[in-house]
């Protein structure tokens, strides 16, 4: 439920003054008045009695309640605007009740499927596998969210990740509701044959309950899953319940190219992390607050987690001039102040199965999260940055490559310490953005650019010829004496953009546009470096608008 307890809890006539001078200053700032206090979202939530629902376990909060707490901060900021923007013939009180009612609808997880099924292992023994699929919101359909294989999967985790997917899709304007799935296994303990059995059976269980389909719910890769598992899912669905559905392969994204996948999907999340950092690190106003110069040129960074997201984030930052000085994994960390080459480290890990022992770096003692660097990229799992270690973090920019790596208490500490946190619901949205492109490709049954490649190339050459002929007529020259020659960059462009070029361009545009929206919201509400609350405000506004304009039918 939406954690708003009502004005009855305030003394008669209470308002901003009830917060004291500091709280009133914060509230005034949230309404656009100048003030020096740094966290208006927290103060306004306190005044309106939005529950900071994570207070029960400050250093290890319930993951779903943690996301709800962040939602409440954004809701407390944007509520007045939502009331003001309602174009209904209702009183102020009725409008506010309507707004709060819709916000209550947005917050909970709509459906959670818990299931178990048996498999026969290669040694002849039998095992019961547990799995979950949570659908947070159907304000847009289909629902969208990854499938992870982990022994630590829980109902709380998939609910939290599903809710994050709803807000993430809204932030980057991808028309999906949020969902997430988890299978409670450690994939390292199973053979490929056993993993295929588990994946195909899990797909059938989802299909029987109506939790998968091109227009219903579309999974994607996540922790410990990739193209292989997505291909099994697509084949299982298309061969059974989707046998008569021409769009059957759109039931899942992150597939191999031969199965309807899209170029650029594997690197999409890491590339999105790079673009997310790029948009803020090149913004002089934010860099001046942090006491840093714009650009990647002189920056150092640390990556926690050398999986798909960590590797590709590292690649792109390295390519644009930043220096990776440390990488951390679950079995240990390595350090080299002169820099670590991502390709060399990737090759070493593929050969040895671990980053430990990499000859061009030394073992790092202590927490990699507390290493001295400019940019920290936590790309492992949730709740890594907590109240305990946040005071010792030395980075000035934290880019949340993982989902939910920062607890609310740590988030408050970072704001107090003037550390910029680029939030997960924006910075790791590259994966779902490119999944959206793949889903559209599957529905259209044609790859991007195939219908226009040659036409665009010929049009560009005709344009150059037209310019050349016009100049020759003007100066009385004929026969190609004033040749118009394209530059090398333009020549590459007009020779025909590949599908990967189109995907990369669209992803960069999406991340840039979303970053500008977050910056404008942060400026509008005087949120300073509280980019997370700004992103939640944007997400809440967009989801609220869908519910408000569609109407709440069956109530």
Curated annotation (Swiss-Prot):
Keywords tagged on the record: ADP-ribosylation, Mitochondrion, NADP, Oxidoreductase, Transit peptide
PROSITE patterns from the UniProt entry: GLFV_DEHYDROGENASE
Keyword Oxidoreductase included in the entry's annotation: yes
FT transit peptide: 1-50
Record flagged with keyword Transit peptide: yes
Mod. after translation: Stoichiometry shows that ADP-ribosylation occurs in one subunit per catalytically active homohexamer.
Pfam short name (any one): ELFV_dehydrog
Modified sites of kind ADP-ribosylcysteine: 169
GO CC annotations, alphabetized: mitochondrial matrix
Catalyzed chemical reaction(s): L-glutamate + NAD(+) + H2O = 2-oxoglutarate + NH4(+) + NADH + H(+); L-glutamate + NADP(+) + H2O = 2-oxoglutarate + NH4(+) + NADPH + H(+)
Record CDD domains: NAD_bind_1_Glu_DH
Main location: mitochondrion
Intrachain disulfide bonds: none
Localization: Mitochondrion matrix
Superkingdom, taxonomy of origin: Eukaryota
Catalytic class of the enzyme: oxidoreductase
GO BP annotation list: glutamate catabolic process
E.C. number(s) listed in UniProt: 1.4.1.3
Binding site for substrate: 81
Catalytic residues, chain numbering: 180
Record-linked InterPro entries: Aminoacid_DH-like_N_sf, Glu/Leu/Phe/Val/Trp_DH, Glu/Leu/Phe/Val/Trp_DH_C, Glu/Leu/Phe/Val/Trp_DH_dimer, Glu/Leu/Phe/Val_DH_AS, NAD(P)-bd_dom_sf, NAD_bind_Glu_DH
Subunit structure, as described in the record: Homohexamer.
Sequence similarity: Belongs to the Glu/Leu/Phe/Val dehydrogenases family.
General function of this protein: Important for recycling the chief excitatory neurotransmitter, glutamate, during neurotransmission.
Entry protein name: Glutamate dehydrogenase 2, mitochondrial
């Amino acid at each position: 439920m939406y954690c708003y307890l009502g004005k009855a809890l305030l003394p008669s006539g209470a308002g901003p003054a009830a917060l004291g001078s500091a709280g009133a200053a914060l509230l005034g700032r949230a309404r656009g008045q100048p003030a020096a206090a740094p966290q208006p979202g927290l103060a306004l939530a306190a005044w309106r009695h939005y529950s900071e629902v994570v207070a029960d376990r400050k250093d290890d909060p319930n993951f779903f309640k943690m996301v709800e707490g962040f939602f409440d901060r954004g809701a407390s900021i944007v509520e007045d605007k939502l009331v003001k923007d309602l174009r209904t013939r209702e009183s102020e009180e009725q409008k506010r009740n309507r707004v709060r009612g819709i916000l209550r609808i947005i917050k909970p997880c709509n459906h959670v499927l818990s299931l178990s099924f048996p498999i026969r292992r290669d040694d002849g023994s039998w095992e019961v596998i547990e799995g979950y699929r949570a659908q947070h919101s159907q304000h847009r359909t289909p629902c969208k969210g990854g499938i992870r294989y982990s022994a630590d999967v829980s109902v709380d985790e998939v609910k939290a990740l599903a809710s994050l997917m709803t807000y993430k899709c809204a932030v980057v304007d991808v028309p999906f509701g949020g969902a997430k799935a988890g299978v409670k296994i450690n994939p390292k303990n199973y053979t490929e044959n056993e993993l295929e059995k588990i994946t195909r059976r899990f797909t059938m269980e989802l299909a029987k309950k109506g939790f998968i389909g091109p227009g219903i719910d579309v999974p994607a890769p996540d922790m410990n899953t990739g193209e292989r598992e997505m291909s099994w899912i697509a084949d299982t669905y298309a061969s059974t319940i989707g046998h008569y559905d021409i769009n059957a392969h759109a039931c899942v994204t992150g597939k191999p190219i031969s199965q309807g996948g899209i170029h650029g999907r594997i690197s999409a999340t890491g590339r999105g992390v790079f673009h997310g950092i790029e948009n803020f690190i090149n913004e002089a106003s934010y860099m001046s607050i942090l006491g840093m110069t714009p650009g990647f040129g002189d920056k150092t960074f640390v990556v926690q987690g050398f999986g798909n997201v960590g590797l590709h984030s590292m690649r792109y930052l390295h390519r644009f001039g930043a220096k990776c000085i440390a990488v951390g994994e679950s079995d240990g960390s390595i350090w080299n102040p002169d820099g670590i080459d991502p390709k060399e480290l990737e090759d070493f890990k593929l050969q040895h199965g671990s980053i430990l022992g990499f000859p061009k770096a030394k073992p790092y003692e202590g927490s990699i999260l507390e290493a001295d660097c400019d940019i920290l990229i936590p790309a492992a799992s949730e709740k890594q940055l907590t109240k305990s270690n946040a005071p010792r973090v030395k980075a000035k920019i934290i880019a949340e490559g993982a989902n939910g790596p920062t607890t609310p208490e740590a988030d408050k500490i970072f704001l107090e310490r003037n550390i910029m946190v680029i939030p997960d619901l924006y910075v790791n949205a590259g994966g779902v953005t490119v999944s959206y492109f793949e889903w559209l490709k599957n529905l259209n049954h044609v790859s991007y650019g195939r219908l226009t490649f040659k036409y665009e190339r010929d049009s560009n050459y005709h344009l150059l010829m037209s310019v050349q002929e016009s100049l020759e007529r003007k100066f009385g020259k004929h026969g190609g004496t004033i040749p118009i020659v394209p530059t090398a960059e333009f020549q590459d462009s007009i020779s025909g953009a590949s599908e990967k070029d189109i995907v990369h361009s669209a992803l960069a545009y999406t991340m840039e546009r979303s970053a500008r929206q977050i910056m404008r919201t942060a400026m509008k509400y005087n949120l300073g470096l509280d980019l997370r609350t700004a992103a939640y405000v944007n997400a809440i506004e967009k989801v609220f608008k869908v519910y408000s304009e569609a109407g709440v039918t069956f109530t």
